[in-house]
Amino acid sequence: MIVSGEITVPARRNAVFEALQNAPFFASCVEGVHDLKEIDATHYDAVLETKVAYMKFTFKVSVEVTRIAPPDRIEAKIEGTPLSVVGRFTAVSNTDLVEAGDETLVRYSIDAAITGKLGSMGQPVLKSKAREMEKKFAERIRAAFESQHAPVAHTTPATPQAAP
């Protein structure tokens, strides 16, 4: 199942790229993610709780950042196992950042494979859930940048001008 889309973020590309690399910030934008643990600079574990149709699922999730091309692209591999039912999901995520004036277009594509009880629900149900999660993610990342709560990009301070 492939899910793709585009989100407009009200910030410059470097700032968005920096924020997306900040695992706690990224996790705070994904509804239902908690207990984030950094294994090393490119590996993370977390718990994801979500409801699909009438069923609630809790997943143990592992993320591996497989490629970073600053400030344009981030690729990751995601694997998850539901804690209460038999199944598994794997996904490869590709994210491209395109500068659009003072905003950034975040273009993403996720190729996911889902097995077990969750996989039996069918693509229309799962795509609907993915769109719902995308909407929440977009709301949260936009709100973080609009309220100045996103991680600040590392910049060199400007040299102060001498007073006249």
Predicted regions and their residues:
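Hydrophobic ligand-binding cavity/cleft-lining segments
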Residues: 1-51, 156-164
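Short beta-strand segments
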Residues: 5, 57-61, 104
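Short strand-connecting beta-turns/loops that link adjacent beta-strands
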Residues: 12, 41, 70, 100-103
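Hydrophobic pocket/interface hotspot
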Residues: 16-20, 26, 65, 108, ...
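Glycine-rich portal/gate segments that line the openings of hydrophobic small-molecule binding cavities
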Residues: 38-81
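Beta-strand/loop substructures that line and gate deep hydrophobic ligand-binding cavities in soluble
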Residues: 62, 75-128
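A conserved amphipathic terminal alpha-helix motif
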Residues: 115-160
